Amino acid sequence: MTISPPEREAKKVKIVVDRDPVETSFEKWAKPGHFSRTLSKGPTTTTWIWNLHADAHDFDAQTTDLEEISRKVFSAHFGQLGIIFIWLSGMYFHGARFSNYEAWLSDPTHIKPSAQVVWPIVGQEILNGDVGGGFQGIQITSGFFQLWRASGITTELQLYSTAIGGLVMAAAMFFAGWFHFHKSAPKLEWFQNVESMLNHHLSGLLGLGSLAWAGHQIHVSLPINKLLDAGVDPHEIPLPHELILNPSLMAQLYPSFKQGLAPFFTLNWSEYSDFLTFQGGLNPVTGGLWLTDTAHHHLAIAVLFIVAGHMYRTNWGIGHSMKEILDAHKGPFTGEGHKGLYEILTTSWHAQLAINLALFGSLSIIVAHHQYSMPPYPYLATDYATQLSLFTHHNWIGGFCIVGAAAHAAIFMIRDYDPTNNYNNLLDRVIRHRDAIISHLNWVCIFLGFHSFGLYIHNDTMSALGRPADMFSDTAIQLQPVFAQWIQKTHFLAPGFTAPNALASTSPSWGGDVVAVGGKVAMMPISLGTSDFLVHHVHAFTIHVTVLILLKGVLYARSSRLIPDKANLGFRFPCDGPGRGGTCQVSAWDHVFLGLFWMYNAISVVIFHFSWKMQSDVWGTVNASGISHITGGNFAQSANTINGWLRDFLWAQSSQVIQSYGSSLSAYGLIFLGAHFVWAFSLMFLFSGRGYWQELIESIVWAHNKLKVAPAIQPRALSITQGRAVGVAHYLLGGIATTWSFFLARIIAVG
């Protein structure tokens, strides 16, 4: 930490906003493309509408003034938050108006969650399945019911109130977006004041946010959930305001409330251990994490982040300076180290966004893996359809964010990177030895690809030849994942040494006893074997190839041996001009395009592995004779051949979606069919040449001219880049919707 010289102390509070910078007017709304000289002239060819969509939000292309760009982005964020609040409000409104939440609350193990009722217009009411408790509706798999129970919501009135609150917040956000662009817009120096931003985001957003949630959990969620777990009728449970205002009510449930704040100020904190616990594992009644553990966790997180938000130097001459930290960060082999990175991160929002997307995407994938192993909400673990949906959803989101990180890193390299300010720092050194990085990464991909695929091919061949003893499997040649098993064992044993008062390890997946709720497995030890070893190497392969493509796109965004002046051609271009063959599809955009396909591959293998593994080895029913898993443990025997994946996973488990017609799951059958069609439609764009379509269009235009109905706007074939964009969008949409309908029809039918 450094202390500032006294002359910096005298800094007075500065005005960091401009008043009324942009007048509010709807004139521009009537003029599509007002932000571009070319587009505002209106359409002459059909390419205009594509360029309009491509450039509407490309603020860099509309102005070079960083302050104006920053204000537009800042204002757009408020608009985004407004839309999120409207969406959330809609979810809560559906819970209040169209759901069986109160019935589900009374019997969450037998009644399924539903918050949508289909109106009978032409027979769609077949979709309203019987979810139990005398309610007909569509089974939802978003996890909102479990979240609401964990929050302590017991009545539909509370859901209505929260829905209205969401709309009020949305209005506030839309107002803020308008106000901070038109009335009081921050100056560039406000956006670049990173120390203030860190302090406010760490202390305010994360610190006080966690503290507020911990307070809600302690005063509202814990008492209500304790009573619900004990079987008290939701209608007889005191309302939140009664619990907050009446300490004697709380003291009946948590005796330490009698003592008030005395133990806190006398540092006798262990008195509060009746509602701030460190038990570990899952609550056997609900199959979720102990809510007293999660309240304790949020309180601890709040303390950490409130402290963290006091670390950076602002108007008082104490604390860290981000620039000083980065400039001082040098190692013996890293040249100038982090010098120059501060300037990059305060002048390039693409660089900032790239880092945030990479972190946020990784975090989303981490959430996916924790929400099944450590289910945070009551009765989440036994709702298999919701578990599968949340896992799948958070993986897809993470994959898209990580590809987006590479996209914006490449845009930064092209639009914002200045080689003169980055001599011999880490970024420059990485770019200078990019050939070594990419060629080594390429070797790793080849190694992983041939070896992982080769193990499967070997097994398929031996299986076809009737030689099971020569296969890699748990019953023949074993390839046990010994490191993963060691990690499981150490995590199972660790709490005994590091947290002797904890009742269990962090998750039953490490080892120990089965946690069953209402005769269903919530979580249990997950045994790993040869089949997991094989598919984990496919995970490694697909992830490394995705990284290879994306990283190559970033490192070669400005120049390459093939096209030394690539930076001048921009982020997306079809080829390096006429007369230079073999230079097509090399733009940074094309790397993002290819990266999306490999991201789709990678995530697909992950969610397929999860879906089959859980059905085979975890999910199922518990009775006196033991555990009966949904697919009876067939993962270990079948998942070690490609044929096994095709026959015993894809084919065997698609019968529910294929045979869903005439049942309440029939929508999934239609989506399955339609999404296959959307996916196939994408191939028409991906496998075709632009000239083919231009020829066809000209012949059709000729026919229109003959009939004197020629259009005023001249039709044009999609450009190569546009065609590829339309192709990849439909490929991903079709693929994801196919997987979604396949998973849900299956798991709702058998789960």
From Swiss-Prot:
The record's family statement is: Belongs to the PsaA/PsaB family.
Positions of chlorophyll a binding? M684, Y692
Entries under Pfam families matching the protein: PsaA_PsaB
Q: Name the GO terms of the biological process aspect.
A: photosynthesis
Give the GO cellular component terms, alphabetically. chloroplast thylakoid membrane; photosystem I
What is the designated name of this protein?
Photosystem I P700 chlorophyll a apoprotein A1
Q: Which InterPro entries match?
A: PSI_PsaA (IPR006243), PSI_PsaA/B (IPR001280), PSI_PsaA/B_CS (IPR020586), PSI_PsaA/B_sf (IPR036408)
Compartments where found:
Plastid, Chloroplast thylakoid membrane
Organism the protein comes from = Tupiella akineta (Green alga)
Q: What is its EC number?
A: 1.97.1.12
Detail which positions bind phylloquinone: W693
Q: Mind listing the UniProt keywords for this protein, alphabetically?
A: 4Fe-4S, Chlorophyll, Chloroplast, Chromophore, Electron transport, Iron, Iron-sulfur, Magnesium, Membrane, Metal-binding, Oxidoreductase, Photosynthesis, Photosystem I, Plastid, Thylakoid, Transmembrane, Transmembrane helix, Transport
Xref: PROSITE patterns? PHOTOSYSTEM_I_PSAAB (PS00419)
Give membrane topology per the record. Answer: Multi-pass membrane protein
Give binding positions for [4Fe-4S] cluster. Answer: C575, C584
Where would you find the membrane-spanning parts of this chain?
A: 73-96, 159-182, 198-222, 294-312, 349-372, 388-414, 436-458, 533-551, 591-612, 665-687, 725-745
Q: Does the keyword Cell division apply?
A: no
This entry's comment on the bound cofactor is: P700 is a chlorophyll a/chlorophyll a' dimer, A0 is one or more chlorophyll a, A1 is one or both phylloquinones and FX is a shared 4Fe-4S iron-sulfur center.
- What gene makes this protein? psaA
Oligomeric state and interaction partners are given as: The PsaA/B heterodimer binds the P700 chlorophyll special pair and subsequent electron acceptors. PSI consists of a core antenna complex that captures photons, and an electron transfer chain that converts photonic excitation into a charge separation. The eukaryotic PSI reaction center is composed of at least 11 subunits.
- Which reaction(s) are listed as its catalytic activity? reduced [plastocyanin] + hnu + oxidized [2Fe-2S]-[ferredoxin] = oxidized [plastocyanin] + reduced [2Fe-2S]-[ferredoxin]
